A protein has these predicted regions:
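Proline-threonine-serine-rich low-complexity tracts
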Residues: 1-188
Length: 188
């Protein structure tokens, strides 16, 4: 800016003023995205945006959408929204999503959102193992798997094999199969 100073006799003098306009204020995060609980099997169940263990680009619209419900602004403009996720545990998996909001001058602000992913739906048994009639005088005649009066490990294959014909499924996968037998009316 150039200033000109004049007196009554027409004499003038000028000077220059420098005005620096600089945005030094970080963007505002009025509301961090809300905590979310998702039914699922792990981080692959997270959308809006997808899980990312490395810094990933997003948008102000996604930060503020109906899923996340964050609120951000800047005295100039928000120019960048990124996030990075850190997952801990299984059943449930708890994800800490760190959002970073930036403006054109490189000012940033961050906040953390918690996303919990958990499988709360029990496995489905579509068909229980069929009734079997076995020739023999005691429980030692039972095979596939052997008779056990205490909880014993088995496998999905044994439950579903040609002898037992059971059918079971789970959206997150079946991780164990056990069985226990009770003998009723066995020949002496």
């Amino acid at each position: 800016r150039t200033w000109t100073i004049s007196d009554a006799c027409g004499n003038t003098n000028t000077c220059n003023q420098t005005i620096n306009v600089d945005d030094t204020g970080a963007p505002f995060i009025t509301t961090c995205p809300v905590a979310r609980v998702i039914e699922g099997c792990g981080t692959s169940s997270i959308t809006g945006p997808d899980y990312s263990a490395v810094s990933a680009s997003s948008t102000e619209a996604v930060f503020e959408n109906g899923t996340n419900q964050g609120v951000t602004s800047d005295n100039c403009a928000v120019t960048s929204v990124t996030y990075i996720d850190v997952a801990v545990g299984t059943c449930p998996t708890v994800v800490t999503r760190t959002w970073t909001v930036s403006d054109a001058c490189g000012n940033t602000n961050t906040c953390n959102q918690t996303i919990t992913v958990d499988d709360t739906v029990m496995p489905t048994i579509t068909t229980c193992a069929v009734t079997r009639n076995i020739e023999g005088c005691n429980t030692s005649a039972i095979s596939g798997p052997a008779f056990s009066t205490v909880s014993a490990p088995s496998s999905e294959g044994e439950f579903e094999n040609g002898t037992n014909l059971g059918v079971a499924s789970d959206a997150c996968g079946i991780t164990s199969v056990t069985y226990i037998d009770v003998a009723v009316g066995v020949c002496p």
